Amino acid sequence: MKGYSEDLYILAFDHRGTITKGLLGVEGREPTQDEANKVSELKQIIFDGFLKANESGITGGDPAILVDETFGLEVQQKAKELNIKFAAPVEKSGQKVFDFEYGDQFREKINEIGADFVKILVRWNPDDEEEIRETQGNRIKELSDWLSENDKKFLLEFLVPATEEQLA
């Protein structure tokens, strides 16, 4: 059976640009090592909370986390050690048009990370320019085909930002 047949409860903390900009005021540059360490510490605190909740018992489905490699590599590694299901994002953070975080090396990176699920976030509006829809559609298909060929699970998160005309 393709897909995942169980209920899955995912604690998502794969935020990158949102955290660095919103909490640390980092904009238009990469975070410093100290800033990156602060974000990694925050992700560890979130993971510790997940572990505490998991120890208390979660019924009705499989608990999992969604965490990025950029600031959450140690969390990903610990999740693997503890046999906790995890998803990893492979999209570039904060992009209006979906692109791969690691460019053409996304396949190698997915294999290296070893996540149970691969996730992308795509901003998509049916009224987007045809070229944007085609570019994103081709990239989604490329990833989907490769994941299917390599027996990997896929999570697709769509955001549908409204245009000014749609809001009027």
Name each region found by the language model:
Residues 1-132:
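Alpha/beta catalytic barrel-like cores
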